[in-house]
Amino acid sequence: MKPSDVRSKAFAMPLTSPAFPMGPYRFVDREFLIITYRTDPDRLREIVPEPLQVTEPLVHYEFIRMADSTGFGDYTESGQVIPVEYNGQAGGYTLAMYLDDHPPIAGGRELWGFPKKLASPTLHVNTDHILGTLDYGKVRVATGTMGYKHKELDIDEQTKRLAGPNFLLKIIPHVDGTARVCELVRYYMQDIKMKGAWTGPASLELAPHALAPVADLPVLEIVEARHLVADLTLGLGEVVYDYLAQ
């Protein structure tokens, strides 16, 4: 294969059978359980990279069920998102994500910079409540519950919240182990069709784990819980800050 052919075909690895396809990346009936809790503000400031700024000592703990996604298939995800500001723009910084499907792990890390790791999350209705769990290996590290559809939320407001900016720290090493890419990336959810939004009483339990340290941001108080169902497109990203260029 000629170098020009390599350049024209190069998108993702392996070259002859990429781990994930080109987009657009559309999700149908994507289901969220988002439990917002208050945590230790000092710990937040230690882990959120500047120029992002922590605005409140809050964390959104998310369980997401994605049964129909373009190119990625059927999978579930769980992780922590921290409310932040960038140049006065409010958004969310994704700290870590745990999921059970290789294509979105590879695509998420290589394309956007999502901090994804392999684990075993679940999200389903358990009789009268919605239940989210996260197992890392044989250890249960997160359990979230919310009363099932106790109260409807405003669809327009929840659509607006979901459409806000999201931030990622994309890191790709060079072959010698030094940083080749170290960038702050911004992306948006697009073409959102909110099909339902509810709230109810909620609980969240996090357990310590060396390699899935969700409990490093302890739950001090549950602030809010939301159960959302939406169709949406995961938009591609843009680099807003290059750490290696500074």
UniProtKB/Swiss-Prot annotation:
Keywords: Decarboxylase, Lyase, Schiff base. The active site is at K116. SUPFAM superfamilies: Acetoacetate decarboxylase-like. It comes from the Bacteria. It catalyses: acetoacetate + H(+) = acetone + CO2. The keyword Transport does not apply. It is an enzyme of class 4 (lyase). One of its GO terms (molecular function) is acetoacetate decarboxylase activity. It holds the Pfam family ADC. Signal peptide: none annotated. Its EC number is 4.1.1.4. Catalyzes the conversion of acetoacetate to acetone and carbon dioxide. Belongs to the ADC family. This is Acetoacetate decarboxylase. It comes from Burkholderia cenocepacia (strain ATCC BAA-245 / DSM 16553 / LMG 16656 / NCTC 13227 / J2315 / CF5610) (Burkholderia cepacia (strain J2315)). The lineage of its organism: Bacteria, Pseudomonadati, Pseudomonadota, Betaproteobacteria, Burkholderiales.
